[in-house]
Regions:
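Hydrophobic/aromatic-rich core segments of domains that either
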Residues: 139, 171-206
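Short, surface-exposed, charge-dense and proline/glycine-enriched linear segments
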Residues: 50-55, 82-85, 117, 163-168, ...
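Secondary-structure boundary elements
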Residues: 13, 70, 76-80, 86, ...
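Generic detector of short, locally flexible boundary/turn motifs and exposed helical patches
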Residues: 3-5, 33-41, 103, 152-154, ...
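Short, glycine/acidic-rich beta->alpha junctions
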Residues: 1, 168-172
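Glycine-centered loop/turn motifs
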Residues: 66, 73, 127, 200-202
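Intrinsically disordered, low-complexity N-terminal segments that are enriched in acidic
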Residues: 1-90
C-alpha cells in the first residue's frame, strides 16, 4: 500500500536558533519511496543534510527570530505487515555479538542500566534466554506503567518511569530497552510518525 506521510510544524524562537530536524524516512527505506519528499520552510532558510551515526537523515538550519513553519510531504510504499513473531529467536552471548551491536548494551541519558540492572535480573533473570524473556519484559512494562498524556514529562527516565509507574509511549520504550540492555540483550527503539491508518477517530492527534 502507498502511505502519504508528512509534517506541518510551527515554531517560535526568541533569538536565531540552530536546529537539527530528523523528519525524513530512514535511509533503509529509500528504495520504498514513491514520491520524493518535499521539505519547505516559511520563511525560506538555507538547509543542509547529513547522515548521523544511526543512519538517520538529518537536516541542519538556523531558525530566524520569530515564527518559522516546517512543512514536508512524501509517499512511501509499505506492505503493512505486522512485526514478525519469532518464538525460536535466541540470545547471542556477549562475546559473540557483532561489534556494531555493543553500543546498544550501554546505558544512556534515559536508560540508566546502572540503576535498573539488579531490578532487571531479579525480575527476569530466571526466565530462559531468548524470545520469551524479551516478551516477558514487554508484558511487564505494559502492565507496570499507567498511560496518560497528562503524565508526560520530557525529562522522565526509564528508572523514574519504573518508580512512578506512569508515562507515555516513550517511557514504555525506554523502560523495556533499559531492561533488555541490563540483561545483555542489545536493544534500541525507533521513533516514527504517528499513523492514523485504520485507527478510530476519538480525539485530535498529537
Amino acid at each position: 500500500m502507498l502511505i502519504r506521510y508528512g509534517f506541518d510544524i510551527a515554531v517560535t524562537c526568541q533569538v536565531p536558533t540552530p536546529m537539527v530536524s530528523m523528519l525524513s524516512a530512514h535511509g533503509e527505506r529509500a528504495h520504498h519511496i514513491r514520491e520524493a519528499e518535499q521539505w519547505v520552510t516559511t520563511p525560506p532558510v538555507a538547509t543542509r543534510t547529513y547522515v548521523d551515526l544511526y543512519g538517520n537523515h538529518c537536516r541542519r538550519f538556523v531558525a530566524p527570530q520569530g515564527d518559522i513553519a516546517l512543512w514536508g510531504d512524501g509517499t512511501i510504499e509499505d506492505g503493512g505487515a505486522s512485526d514478525p513473531v519469532l518464538h525460536g529467536a535466541r540470545e547471542v552471548p556477549v562475546p559473540d555479538l557483532p561489534d556494531g551491536c555493543l553500543i546498544y548494551l550501554l546505558g544512556s541519558r534515559y536508560c540508566e542500566t546502572d540503576r535498573l540492572s539488579q531490578i532487571a535480573w531479579d525480575l527476569f533473570g530466571h526466565i530462559p534466554p531468548g524470545w520469551g524473556r524479551v516478551q516477558a519484559i514487554c508484558d511487564f512494562v505494559h502492565g507496570h506503567i499507567r498511560f496518560g498524556y497528562l503524565d508526560a514529562r520530557a525529562t522522565r527516565t526509564a528508572a523514574e518511569a519504573y518508580e512512578e509507574r506512569m508515562g507515555v509511549c516513550r517511557d514504555y520504550a525506554h523502560l523495556a530497552v533499559a531492561f533488555c540492555r541490563c540483561l545483555n540483550i542489545p536493544a534500541r527503539y525507533v521513533n516514527g510518525y504517528l499513523g492514523d491508518i485504520g485507527v478510530p477517530i476519538v480525539d485530535p492527534m498529537d
